[in-house]
């Protein structure tokens, strides 16, 4: 299976096809129904170390790390990319706080479901290879997102019971991205998280999630 080619990489770089796990037509489900369908389990952080999720790698060996790939993909203008796939400028919209950013150093690449939360929710039982794939998931635009460093660090490893984006306009999209990511990777929710997701989703009308899984 072939990944969508990430755009705007330096012409001097050899660009290889990227692999994807997404089906041609992803199945959709109403957000509220998706929340109810997520597996339920208590969380445990025993044994967690961030280093158990290797990132940012150059999976396709095109010279660009996962971080660079996301910056290139999400820039709303053609990014300037220097030798070594160093992204030096572009235009990014941080949807968590509705900010437009033109300096890549002001951005973090957020794991939609943080690494620690993924560990708590089932990744503790994965192989090292699957954890690496999770931490560098370019197969879904929901998995990794460029946002202001300030909001990413405010979020840290918290779930929606503990943190939501500062912009109310972002909440429904954030919930959909969160639930879709949990579906994609077969991750569970605990009681507080499920209750928070359910309550927040009440104002999200026809918002849908992607239920494709890998």
Which ranges hold each PLM region?
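Secretory targeting and sorting signals
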Residues: 1-26
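Active-site-proximal flexible loops/turns
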Residues: 20, 69, 118-121
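N-terminal module-boundary/linker segments of secreted carbohydrate-active enzymes
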Residues: 24-61, 193-195, 206-214
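Short, motif-level signal for alpha-helix interfacial/capping segments enriched in acidic residues
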Residues: 38, 84-98
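N-terminal carbohydrate-binding/catalytic regions of secreted carbohydrate-active enzymes
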Residues: 49-88
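Domain-level detector of nuclease and nuclease-like folds
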Residues: 92-214
């Amino acid at each position: 299976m072939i990944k969508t080619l990430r755009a705007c990489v330096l012409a001097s770089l050899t660009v290889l096809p990227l692999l994807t796990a997404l089906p041609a037509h992803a199945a959709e489900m109403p957000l509220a129904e998706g929340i109810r369908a997520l597996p339920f389990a208590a969380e445990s952080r025993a044994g967690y170390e961030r280093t158990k999720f290797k990132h940012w790698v150059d999976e396709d060996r095109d010279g660009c790390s996962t971080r660079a790939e996301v910056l290139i993909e999400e820039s709303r203008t053609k990014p300037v990319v220097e030798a070594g796939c160093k992204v030096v400028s572009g235009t990014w919209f941080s949807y968590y706080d509705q900010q437009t950013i033109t300096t890549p150093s002001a951005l973090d690449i957020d794991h939609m479901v943080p690494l620690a939360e993924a560990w708590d929710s089932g990744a503790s039982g994965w192989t090292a290879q699957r954890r690496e794939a999770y931490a560098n998931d370019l197969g879904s635009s929901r998995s990794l997102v460029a946002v202001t460093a300030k909001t990413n660090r405010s979020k840290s490893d918290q779930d929606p019971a503990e943190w939501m984006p500062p912009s109310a306009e972002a909440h429904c999209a954030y919930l959909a991205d969160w639930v879709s990511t949990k579906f994609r990777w077969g991750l569970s929710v605990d009681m507080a998280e499920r209750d928070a997701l359910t309550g927040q989703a009440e104002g999200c009308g026809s918002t849908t999630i992607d239920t494709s899984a890998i």
